[in-house]
Amino acid sequence: MAKGPVSTSSDDELPFETQEPIAADERSFFGGQPQKPSAPNARAALPASLAGQEHYHGHRERLRDRFREQGDAALADYEILELLLFRLIPRRDTKPIAKALIERFGSLAGVFGAPQALLMEVKGVGEAVALDLKLISTVAHRTLKSELRTKQVLSSWSSVIQYCHAAMAHETREQFRILFLDKRNVLIADEVQGRGTVDHTPVYPREVVKRALELSATAMVLVHNHPSGDPTPSRADIDMTKVIIDAAKALDITVHDHIIIGKDGHVSLKGLKLI
């Protein structure tokens, strides 16, 4: 009979029994520190696998201490991600995984915006970890959206851009989204009306206006992304926007703007005086 709890995960199985201080350490970001060896030469007597475990647990505590005492400004992006991965992958050195994710996707935003299938292409990231990363991304998006619901959209334009960028900038396919507003310009609904290819998504002006009527919306903000990263509008983007504006105007529905989101910025068709 085992004397203590033993890992049952095939990915994380260890050739030794898990000690209680380590288990307590993994229950939270700021759990108790692992027990120190009782004798100066105790580390030297440890098996190689145990010595490696002790090393990265010490690294985890140092990283937690820096975050606790100095905040996120003291940590690089990969270290923030590493802190998170401590919880998702509790018995493995997560620094190489965090660095590989940042290298593959370019930034924290890129990691959290990446599709699950692409996340799982990174060595060390399985389905469970990829799903957890997408869950965290969803929480962030919903937080930003909830802030929009309490504000007048036109007077909180920076919040609109921040939300749209978080939701769409790292999508690998074009996505056409509409923010439906009431007569006070408060958000009624945020809906994705279409998903397409890497450089095109079908848009049906009649369906756009029909949905606005169903929601009793009196105004809209159109948004779509360019997976290439360049938010410069195409002639098709401009023409399609004008068709929607004309269809909506006939029913007293205002189109305030059409925003195009890229990885590193955005473009407003109204700001460019194209509509």
Swiss-Prot record:
SUPFAM superfamilies: JAB1/MPN domain, RuvA domain 2-like. It holds the Pfam family UPF0758_N. CDD domains: MPN_DUF2466. This is UPF0758 protein RL2068. Zn(2+) binds at H224, H226, D237. Residues 1-45 are annotated as: Disordered. A motif (JAMM motif) lies at residues 224-237. Keywords: Hydrolase, Metal-binding, Metalloprotease, Protease, Zinc. The lineage of its organism: Bacteria, Pseudomonadati, Pseudomonadota, Alphaproteobacteria, Hyphomicrobiales. GO terms for molecular function: metal ion binding; metallopeptidase activity. Belongs to the UPF0758 family. Residues 153-275 form the MPN domain. One of its GO terms (biological process) is proteolysis.
